[in-house]
C-alpha cells in the first residue's frame, strides 16, 4: 500500500506514502507545539506495529524522560498525573501493559549530548551487529540544532548546513529514513511575519541548506496554541 514505512498516521502516510528509505525528513515547530511527542508517537508506532527497529537520539532529554514520555502516551495517562504519581487504580494496569509493550519493542535510545554524526553512525553500527534482531530501520533525532560537527566553527549556519548534508548522506548510506526535529526562528511569532503564525521554510532556524538537503519538511502548527496566549 505504501512505498515506505507507515507512520501509523493515516493522513500523513497518504501524503508521504510512508517514510522513504534514504529520505531525510525535517519535523519543525516552535517550542511547546508538540514536535517531540509527535516524533515519539511515530517512533513507537513504527517499532510496535511494524516491528521495525528504531534508534532515537535525544540531545535534549534523558533516556528516563524519553521512557516516561512514551509510557504515559502508550498508557493514555495525563503526563502531569504520570509525573506526580497521582494515578487511578486502572492507570496502573494500563501502565503495566505499556511497560510490557515498550520492553518488547525494538527501540534503541541514546541521550548523548552534542553528539556528532560520526558517533551516531558508530552507535547504529554496534546496534546492527546484534544477530538476533533486524537492522535499525528508522532514526529519530531530537533535535538538529543541538548536534555538533565535532570541529570548531564560528558560523552556526554553515555548521548546521554541514550537519544536514551529512544526515542526508547517512540516510542514503544506511538506506533508512531519518526524522530530524528542528527549531523555528522567533520570527514566526511576530505578526508581521505572517498574520496566522503559520511557519514557512524561511522560518527554519539556522536554516542554511536545511530545505535543500531535506526530502520533506513537515511543520507542526496549532491555532489553539496562539489563541490561548
Task: Go through the PLM ranges and name each one.
Residues 14, 41, 45-135, 149:
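Cytosolic-facing regulatory segments adjacent to core modules
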Residues 1-14:
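N-terminal pre-Walker A segment at the start of P-loop NTPase domains
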Residues 69-78, 145-168, 190, 199:
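Conserved P-loop NTPase nucleotide-binding/switch module
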Residues 9, 17-61, 118-130, 137-140, ...:
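P-loop NTPase nucleotide-binding module
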Residues 32, 61-64, 72-73, 87, ...:
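Conserved nucleotide-binding/hydrolysis micro-motifs of P-loop NTPases
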Residues 13, 159-229:
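Phosphate-binding/switch region of NTP-binding enzymes
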Residues 6-9, 63-67, 89-99, 114-121, ...:
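Amphipathic alpha-helical transducer elements in NTP-driven molecular machines
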Amino acid at each position: 500500500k505504501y512505498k515506505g514505512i507507515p507512520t501509523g498516521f493515516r493522513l500523513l502516510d497518504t501524503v508521504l506514502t510512508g517514510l522513504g528509505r534514504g529520505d531525510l525528513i525535517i519535523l519543525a515547530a516552535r517550542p511547546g507545539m508538540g514536535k517531540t511527542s509527535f516524533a515519539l508517537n511515530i517512533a513507537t508506532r513504527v517499532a510496535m506495529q511494524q516491528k521495525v527497529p528504531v534508534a532515537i537520539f535525544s540531545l535534549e532529554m534523558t533516556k528516563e524522560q524519553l521512557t516516561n514520555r512514551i509510557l504515559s502516551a502508550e498508557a493514555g495517562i495525563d503526563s502531569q498525573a504520570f509525573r506526580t504519581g497521582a494515578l487511578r487504580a486502572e492507570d496502573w494496569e494500563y501502565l503495566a501493559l505499556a511497560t510490557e509493550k515498550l520492553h518488547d519493542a525494538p527501540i534503541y535510545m541514546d541521550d548523548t549530548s552534542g553528539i556528532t554524526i560520526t558517533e551516531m553512525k558508530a552507535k547504529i553500527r554496534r546496534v546492527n551487529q546484534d544477530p538476533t534482531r533486524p537492522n535499525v530501520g528508522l532514526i529519530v533525532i531530537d533535535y538538529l540544532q543541538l548536534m555538533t560537527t565535532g570541529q570548531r566553527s564560528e558560523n552556526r549556519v554553515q555548521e548546521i548546513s554541514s550537519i544536514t548534508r551529512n544526515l542526508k548522506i547517512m540516510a542514503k548510506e544506511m538506506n533508512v529514513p531519518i526524522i530530524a526535529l528542528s527549531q523555528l526562528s522567533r520570527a514566526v511569532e511576530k505578526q508581521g511575519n505572517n498574520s496566522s503564525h503559520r511557519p514557512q521554510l524561511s522560518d527554519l532556524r539556522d536554516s542554511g541548506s536545511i530545505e535543500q538537503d531535506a526530502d520533506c519538511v513537515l511543520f507542526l502548527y496549532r491555532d489553539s496554541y496562539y489563541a490561548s496566549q
